[in-house]
Protein backbone atom coordinates (compact mmCIF):
# COMPACT_ATOMS: atom_id res chain seq x y z
CA UNK A 1 0.00 0.00 0.00
CA UNK A 2 1.44 3.35 -1.05
CA UNK A 3 1.77 5.90 1.73
CA UNK A 4 -0.20 9.09 1.22
CA UNK A 5 2.13 11.99 0.53
CA UNK A 6 1.73 15.07 2.68
CA UNK A 7 0.99 18.12 0.51
CA UNK A 8 1.45 21.30 2.52
CA UNK A 9 0.17 23.56 -0.26
CA UNK A 10 -3.08 21.62 -0.53
CA UNK A 11 -3.51 21.72 3.23
CA UNK A 12 -3.10 25.50 3.26
CA UNK A 13 -5.54 25.98 0.36
CA UNK A 14 -8.21 23.82 1.99
CA UNK A 15 -7.71 25.47 5.37
CA UNK A 16 -8.00 28.91 3.78
CA UNK A 17 -11.26 27.92 2.08
CA UNK A 18 -12.75 26.52 5.29
CA UNK A 19 -11.47 29.51 7.24
CA UNK A 20 -13.02 31.87 4.71
CA UNK A 21 -16.41 30.22 5.19
CA UNK A 22 -16.03 30.49 8.96
CA UNK A 23 -15.00 34.14 8.65
CA UNK A 24 -18.07 34.95 6.56
CA UNK A 25 -20.33 33.38 9.19
CA UNK A 26 -18.60 35.38 11.93
CA UNK A 27 -18.89 38.61 9.96
CA UNK A 28 -22.59 38.01 9.35
CA UNK A 29 -23.06 37.55 13.10
CA UNK A 30 -21.03 40.68 13.86
CA UNK A 31 -22.95 42.74 11.33
CA UNK A 32 -26.22 41.67 12.90
CA UNK A 33 -25.20 43.19 16.22
CA UNK A 34 -23.17 46.07 14.81
CA UNK A 35 -24.32 49.16 16.72
CA UNK A 36 -23.41 52.84 16.66
CA UNK A 37 -21.20 53.75 19.61
CA UNK A 38 -22.18 56.59 21.92
CA UNK A 39 -20.63 58.50 24.81
CA UNK A 40 -21.76 58.38 28.44
CA UNK A 41 -24.20 61.03 29.61
CA UNK A 42 -24.11 63.05 32.83
CA UNK A 43 -25.79 65.99 34.52
CA UNK A 44 -25.06 69.70 34.49
CA UNK A 45 -22.89 69.64 37.61
CA UNK A 46 -20.45 67.16 36.02
CA UNK A 47 -20.50 69.15 32.77
CA UNK A 48 -19.64 72.32 34.69
CA UNK A 49 -16.82 70.55 36.54
CA UNK A 50 -15.28 69.33 33.28
CA UNK A 51 -15.64 72.71 31.56
CA UNK A 52 -14.26 74.69 34.49
CA UNK A 53 -17.30 76.87 35.15
CA UNK A 54 -20.46 76.85 37.26
CA UNK A 55 -23.76 75.18 36.48
CA UNK A 56 -25.48 78.58 36.63
CA UNK A 57 -23.10 79.89 33.97
CA UNK A 58 -24.13 77.05 31.66
CA UNK A 59 -27.81 77.77 32.29
CA UNK A 60 -27.29 81.46 31.51
CA UNK A 61 -25.48 80.66 28.24
CA UNK A 62 -28.30 78.35 27.21
CA UNK A 63 -30.95 80.90 28.13
CA UNK A 64 -29.21 83.63 26.09
CA UNK A 65 -28.86 81.30 23.10
CA UNK A 66 -25.05 81.22 23.26
CA UNK A 67 -25.32 77.44 23.57
CA UNK A 68 -27.84 75.04 22.03
CA UNK A 69 -30.76 74.10 24.21
CA UNK A 70 -29.82 71.13 26.38
CA UNK A 71 -31.20 67.65 25.98
CA UNK A 72 -33.69 66.76 28.69
CA UNK A 73 -34.67 63.48 30.31
CA UNK A 74 -37.45 62.79 32.76
CA UNK A 75 -36.27 62.35 36.33
CA UNK A 76 -39.40 61.77 38.35
CA UNK A 77 -41.52 64.90 38.36
CA UNK A 78 -38.80 67.10 36.82
CA UNK A 79 -36.73 67.18 33.68
CA UNK A 80 -32.97 66.89 34.00
CA UNK A 81 -30.37 68.40 31.67
CA UNK A 82 -27.94 65.85 30.23
CA UNK A 83 -24.63 66.29 28.42
CA UNK A 84 -21.78 64.23 27.00
CA UNK A 85 -18.08 64.92 26.36
CA UNK A 86 -18.72 66.34 22.89
CA UNK A 87 -21.18 68.86 24.30
CA UNK A 88 -18.72 69.78 27.05
CA UNK A 89 -16.13 70.61 24.37
CA UNK A 90 -18.63 72.90 22.65
CA UNK A 91 -19.25 74.52 26.03
CA UNK A 92 -15.50 75.01 26.53
CA UNK A 93 -15.29 76.70 23.14
CA UNK A 94 -18.17 79.03 24.04
CA UNK A 95 -16.51 80.21 27.25
CA UNK A 96 -12.98 80.34 25.82
CA UNK A 97 -11.62 77.39 27.81
CA UNK A 98 -10.98 74.86 25.05
CA UNK A 99 -7.32 73.80 25.37
CA UNK A 100 -4.92 73.59 22.45
CA UNK A 101 -1.21 73.49 21.80
CA UNK A 102 0.54 76.84 22.35
CA UNK A 103 1.09 79.24 19.47
CA UNK A 104 4.42 78.41 17.86
CA UNK A 105 4.36 74.78 19.03
CA UNK A 106 4.00 71.75 16.79
CA UNK A 107 1.77 68.73 17.15
CA UNK A 108 3.32 66.27 19.62
CA UNK A 109 3.46 62.62 18.55
CA UNK A 110 3.22 60.13 21.42
CA UNK A 111 4.06 56.48 20.68
CA UNK A 112 3.29 53.58 23.01
CA UNK A 113 5.97 51.02 22.28
CA UNK A 114 7.53 47.85 23.67
CA UNK A 115 8.95 44.65 22.19
CA UNK A 116 6.76 42.51 24.42
CA UNK A 117 3.05 41.83 24.15
CA UNK A 118 0.65 41.79 27.08
CA UNK A 119 1.98 44.99 28.66
CA UNK A 120 -1.20 47.08 28.03
CA UNK A 121 0.11 49.17 25.13
CA UNK A 122 -3.25 49.16 23.39
CA UNK A 123 -5.22 49.71 26.58
CA UNK A 124 -3.11 52.70 27.55
CA UNK A 125 -2.89 54.28 24.09
CA UNK A 126 -6.68 54.00 23.71
CA UNK A 127 -7.43 55.50 27.11
CA UNK A 128 -4.80 58.22 26.70
CA UNK A 129 -6.25 59.33 23.36
CA UNK A 130 -9.76 59.39 24.82
CA UNK A 131 -8.52 61.25 27.89
CA UNK A 132 -7.05 63.94 25.63
CA UNK A 133 -10.35 64.19 23.74
CA UNK A 134 -12.25 64.39 27.02
CA UNK A 135 -10.01 67.26 28.07
CA UNK A 136 -10.78 69.10 24.82
CA UNK A 137 -7.68 68.57 22.64
CA UNK A 138 -7.78 67.72 18.92
CA UNK A 139 -6.43 64.18 18.74
CA UNK A 140 -5.52 61.61 16.11
CA UNK A 141 -5.13 57.99 17.21
CA UNK A 142 -3.12 55.83 14.80
CA UNK A 143 -3.55 52.06 15.00
CA UNK A 144 -0.28 50.64 13.66
CA UNK A 145 -0.94 47.15 15.01
CA UNK A 146 -2.35 44.66 12.46
CA UNK A 147 -4.24 42.97 15.29
CA UNK A 148 -6.52 46.05 15.06
CA UNK A 149 -7.71 45.89 18.67
CA UNK A 150 -7.76 49.68 18.93
CA UNK A 151 -9.73 49.86 15.69
CA UNK A 152 -12.32 47.43 17.04
CA UNK A 153 -12.69 49.53 20.19
CA UNK A 154 -14.24 52.29 18.05
CA UNK A 155 -16.83 49.99 16.54
CA UNK A 156 -15.03 49.28 13.27
CA UNK A 157 -14.92 45.67 12.13
CA UNK A 158 -11.81 45.57 9.90
CA UNK A 159 -12.99 42.93 7.42
CA UNK A 160 -16.49 44.40 7.29
CA UNK A 161 -16.07 48.18 7.48
CA UNK A 162 -12.60 48.73 6.04
CA UNK A 163 -10.97 48.06 2.70
CA UNK A 164 -7.82 48.85 0.76
CA UNK A 165 -6.60 52.35 1.50
CA UNK A 166 -8.19 52.50 4.95
CA UNK A 167 -4.94 51.97 6.86
CA UNK A 168 -1.31 53.16 6.81
CA UNK A 169 -0.17 51.02 3.89
CA UNK A 170 -0.71 53.52 1.01
CA UNK A 171 0.99 56.35 2.94
CA UNK A 172 4.04 54.17 3.60
CA UNK A 173 4.36 52.66 0.13
CA UNK A 174 2.87 55.16 -2.35
CA UNK A 175 2.70 58.77 -1.09
CA UNK A 176 2.70 60.30 2.41
CA UNK A 177 -0.30 62.52 1.60
CA UNK A 178 -2.50 59.43 1.20
CA UNK A 179 -2.61 59.12 4.97
CA UNK A 180 -5.42 61.70 4.99
CA UNK A 181 -7.69 59.28 3.11
CA UNK A 182 -7.40 56.74 5.93
CA UNK A 183 -8.71 59.07 8.66
CA UNK A 184 -12.04 58.03 10.17
CA UNK A 185 -14.24 60.13 12.40
CA UNK A 186 -15.28 58.53 15.68
CA UNK A 187 -18.09 59.09 18.16
CA UNK A 188 -15.71 61.49 19.94
CA UNK A 189 -15.94 64.77 17.99
CA UNK A 190 -12.32 65.74 18.71
CA UNK A 191 -10.81 62.26 18.25
CA UNK A 192 -10.08 60.84 14.80
CA UNK A 193 -8.76 57.37 14.04
CA UNK A 194 -6.50 55.84 11.42
CA UNK A 195 -7.57 52.20 11.64
CA UNK A 196 -5.64 48.99 11.10
CA UNK A 197 -6.47 45.74 9.34
CA UNK A 198 -4.88 42.31 9.44
CA UNK A 199 -3.54 43.00 5.94
CA UNK A 200 -1.40 45.77 7.44
CA UNK A 201 1.11 43.12 8.52
CA UNK A 202 2.13 42.87 4.86
CA UNK A 203 3.68 46.33 5.34
CA UNK A 204 6.55 44.91 7.39
CA UNK A 205 7.52 42.58 4.54
CA UNK A 206 7.00 45.18 1.82
CA UNK A 207 9.15 47.85 3.48
CA UNK A 208 12.00 45.39 4.03
CA UNK A 209 12.38 44.70 0.29
CA UNK A 210 15.55 46.03 -1.43
CA UNK A 211 13.61 48.13 -3.94
CA UNK A 212 11.95 50.05 -1.10
CA UNK A 213 15.33 51.09 0.28
CA UNK A 214 16.11 52.59 -3.13
CA UNK A 215 12.90 54.63 -3.36
CA UNK A 216 14.29 58.16 -3.09
CA UNK A 217 10.91 59.88 -3.46
CA UNK A 218 9.49 58.20 -0.33
CA UNK A 219 12.73 58.18 1.66
CA UNK A 220 14.15 55.47 3.93
CA UNK A 221 11.46 52.91 4.88
CA UNK A 222 11.72 53.47 8.67
CA UNK A 223 10.96 57.22 8.48
CA UNK A 224 7.96 57.24 6.16
CA UNK A 225 5.32 57.43 8.89
CA UNK A 226 7.05 60.54 10.22
CA UNK A 227 6.75 62.18 6.81
CA UNK A 228 3.11 61.14 6.49
CA UNK A 229 2.13 62.44 9.93
CA UNK A 230 3.86 65.75 9.21
CA UNK A 231 1.23 66.36 6.52
CA UNK A 232 -1.49 66.22 9.22
CA UNK A 233 0.12 68.35 11.91
CA UNK A 234 -2.05 71.44 11.37
CA UNK A 235 -5.19 69.41 12.12
CA UNK A 236 -4.28 68.11 15.57
CA UNK A 237 -2.75 69.07 18.90
CA UNK A 238 -1.52 65.55 19.64
CA UNK A 239 -1.12 62.31 17.69
CA UNK A 240 -1.10 58.99 19.59
CA UNK A 241 0.26 55.80 18.00
CA UNK A 242 -0.39 52.22 19.13
CA UNK A 243 2.28 49.77 17.92
CA UNK A 244 2.54 45.99 17.45
CA UNK A 245 4.43 43.89 20.04
CA UNK A 246 7.43 43.44 17.76
CA UNK A 247 10.16 45.52 16.19
CA UNK A 248 9.33 45.27 12.51
CA UNK A 249 9.00 48.15 10.07
CA UNK A 250 5.70 49.36 11.53
CA UNK A 251 7.22 49.75 14.99
CA UNK A 252 10.39 51.31 13.58
CA UNK A 253 8.29 53.86 11.71
CA UNK A 254 6.37 54.71 14.86
CA UNK A 255 9.58 55.18 16.87
CA UNK A 256 11.10 57.38 14.17
CA UNK A 257 7.93 59.49 14.16
CA UNK A 258 7.81 60.01 17.92
CA UNK A 259 8.53 63.07 20.00
CA UNK A 260 7.57 61.17 23.14
CA UNK A 261 7.79 57.41 23.68
CA UNK A 262 5.78 55.77 26.44
CA UNK A 263 7.13 52.33 27.23
CA UNK A 264 4.73 50.19 29.29
CA UNK A 265 6.45 47.54 31.42
CA UNK A 266 4.85 44.89 33.61
CA UNK A 267 7.10 44.53 36.71
CA UNK A 268 7.99 40.88 36.06
CA UNK A 269 11.46 39.52 35.40
CA UNK A 270 10.76 38.52 31.78
CA UNK A 271 9.54 42.03 31.02
CA UNK A 272 12.56 43.59 32.72
CA UNK A 273 14.88 41.44 30.58
CA UNK A 274 12.94 42.43 27.46
CA UNK A 275 13.36 46.11 28.30
CA UNK A 276 17.15 45.75 28.25
CA UNK A 277 17.04 44.35 24.72
CA UNK A 278 14.59 47.07 23.70
CA UNK A 279 16.95 49.85 24.75
CA UNK A 280 19.87 48.20 22.93
CA UNK A 281 17.82 48.07 19.73
CA UNK A 282 16.71 51.69 20.16
CA UNK A 283 20.35 52.75 20.45
CA UNK A 284 21.14 50.95 17.19
CA UNK A 285 18.18 52.61 15.47
CA UNK A 286 19.36 56.03 16.63
CA UNK A 287 22.84 55.33 15.28
CA UNK A 288 21.42 54.43 11.86
CA UNK A 289 18.84 57.22 11.57
CA UNK A 290 20.16 59.92 13.86
CA UNK A 291 19.13 62.82 11.62
CA UNK A 292 15.56 61.59 11.16
CA UNK A 293 14.76 60.66 14.77
CA UNK A 294 13.50 63.43 17.04
CA UNK A 295 12.53 61.64 20.25
CA UNK A 296 12.71 64.26 22.98
CA UNK A 297 11.59 62.17 25.90
CA UNK A 298 11.00 58.56 26.90
CA UNK A 299 8.81 57.59 29.85
CA UNK A 300 8.45 54.15 31.40
CA UNK A 301 4.95 53.30 32.62
CA UNK A 302 4.51 50.41 35.04
CA UNK A 303 1.34 48.47 34.24
CA UNK A 304 -0.60 45.57 35.75
CA UNK A 305 0.91 46.40 39.12
CA UNK A 306 -0.28 44.35 42.09
CA UNK A 307 0.71 44.50 45.74
CA UNK A 308 2.69 41.26 45.92
CA UNK A 309 6.13 41.18 47.49
CA UNK A 310 7.64 39.92 44.24
CA UNK A 311 6.15 42.83 42.29
CA UNK A 312 7.36 45.37 44.83
CA UNK A 313 10.87 43.88 44.70
CA UNK A 314 10.84 44.02 40.91
CA UNK A 315 9.69 47.65 40.99
CA UNK A 316 12.69 48.43 43.19
CA UNK A 317 14.96 46.78 40.60
CA UNK A 318 13.37 48.76 37.76
CA UNK A 319 13.61 51.97 39.75
CA UNK A 320 17.30 51.33 40.38
CA UNK A 321 17.97 50.94 36.66
CA UNK A 322 15.55 53.45 35.12
CA UNK A 323 14.52 55.70 38.00
CA UNK A 324 14.62 59.03 36.13
CA UNK A 325 12.55 57.55 33.29
CA UNK A 326 9.75 56.15 35.44
CA UNK A 327 6.38 57.87 35.61
CA UNK A 328 5.35 58.40 39.21
CA UNK A 329 1.82 57.15 38.46
CA UNK A 330 1.29 53.44 37.81
CA UNK A 331 -1.52 51.40 36.30
CA UNK A 332 -2.63 48.68 38.67
CA UNK A 333 -4.62 45.56 37.96
CA UNK A 334 -8.34 46.30 37.86
CA UNK A 335 -11.28 44.10 36.95
CA UNK A 336 -13.19 47.14 35.73
CA UNK A 337 -10.87 47.43 32.73
CA UNK A 338 -11.34 43.77 31.87
CA UNK A 339 -15.12 43.99 32.17
CA UNK A 340 -15.43 47.13 30.05
CA UNK A 341 -13.09 45.68 27.41
CA UNK A 342 -15.30 42.60 27.09
CA UNK A 343 -18.08 45.00 26.02
CA UNK A 344 -15.75 46.72 23.51
CA UNK A 345 -15.77 49.86 25.65
CA UNK A 346 -13.16 51.89 27.48
CA UNK A 347 -13.52 52.98 31.08
CA UNK A 348 -14.19 56.50 29.81
CA UNK A 349 -17.15 55.29 27.73
CA UNK A 350 -19.25 53.32 30.18
CA UNK A 351 -22.36 54.80 31.78
CA UNK A 352 -22.46 52.44 34.74
CA UNK A 353 -19.68 50.46 36.43
CA UNK A 354 -19.52 46.78 35.48
CA UNK A 355 -18.52 46.00 39.07
CA UNK A 356 -18.63 48.05 42.25
CA UNK A 357 -18.63 51.84 42.17
CA UNK A 358 -15.45 51.88 44.29
CA UNK A 359 -13.61 49.65 41.80
CA UNK A 360 -14.73 51.89 38.95
CA UNK A 361 -13.64 55.06 40.76
CA UNK A 362 -10.21 53.56 41.50
CA UNK A 363 -9.78 52.64 37.84
CA UNK A 364 -10.72 56.17 36.74
CA UNK A 365 -8.32 57.70 39.28
CA UNK A 366 -5.45 55.49 38.12
CA UNK A 367 -6.08 56.24 34.45
CA UNK A 368 -6.48 59.96 35.02
CA UNK A 369 -3.28 60.04 37.07
CA UNK A 370 -1.23 58.23 34.42
CA UNK A 371 -2.74 60.17 31.52
CA UNK A 372 -2.32 63.57 33.16
CA UNK A 373 1.37 62.81 33.76
CA UNK A 374 1.90 61.81 30.12
CA UNK A 375 0.08 64.97 29.01
CA UNK A 376 2.38 66.99 31.27
CA UNK A 377 5.38 65.48 29.46
CA UNK A 378 3.83 66.53 26.13
CA UNK A 379 3.23 70.04 27.44
CA UNK A 380 6.87 70.27 28.48
CA UNK A 381 7.85 69.43 24.89
CA UNK A 382 5.59 72.27 23.72
CA UNK A 383 7.11 74.66 26.23
CA UNK A 384 10.65 73.77 25.18
CA UNK A 385 9.77 74.28 21.51
CA UNK A 386 8.20 77.68 22.19
CA UNK A 387 11.19 78.72 24.32
CA UNK A 388 13.63 77.60 21.63
CA UNK A 389 11.67 79.61 19.07
CA UNK A 390 11.82 82.72 21.25
CA UNK A 391 15.56 82.29 21.81
CA UNK A 392 16.16 81.77 18.09
CA UNK A 393 14.14 84.89 17.32
CA UNK A 394 16.07 86.95 19.84
CA UNK A 395 19.39 85.70 18.48
CA UNK A 396 18.31 86.58 14.93
CA UNK A 397 17.19 90.04 16.04
CA UNK A 398 20.45 90.63 17.90
CA UNK A 399 22.45 89.59 14.84
CA UNK A 400 20.42 91.85 12.56
CA UNK A 401 20.93 94.92 14.78
CA UNK A 402 24.63 94.42 15.52
Give residue spans per PLM region.
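P-loop NTP-binding core
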Residues: 1-46, 50, 55-402
Amino acid sequence: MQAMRFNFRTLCRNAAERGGQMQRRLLDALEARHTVKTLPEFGIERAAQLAGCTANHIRNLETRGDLPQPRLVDAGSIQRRIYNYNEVNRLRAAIGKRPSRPAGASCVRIVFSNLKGGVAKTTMSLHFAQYLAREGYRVLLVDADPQATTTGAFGFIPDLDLGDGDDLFPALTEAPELIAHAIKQTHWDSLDLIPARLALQYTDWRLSQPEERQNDSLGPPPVRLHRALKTLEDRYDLIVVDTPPSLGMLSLNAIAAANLIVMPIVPHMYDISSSVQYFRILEQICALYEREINVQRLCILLTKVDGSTETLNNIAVINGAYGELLLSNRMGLTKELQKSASDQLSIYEIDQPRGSRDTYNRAIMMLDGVNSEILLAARQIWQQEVLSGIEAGEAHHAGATS
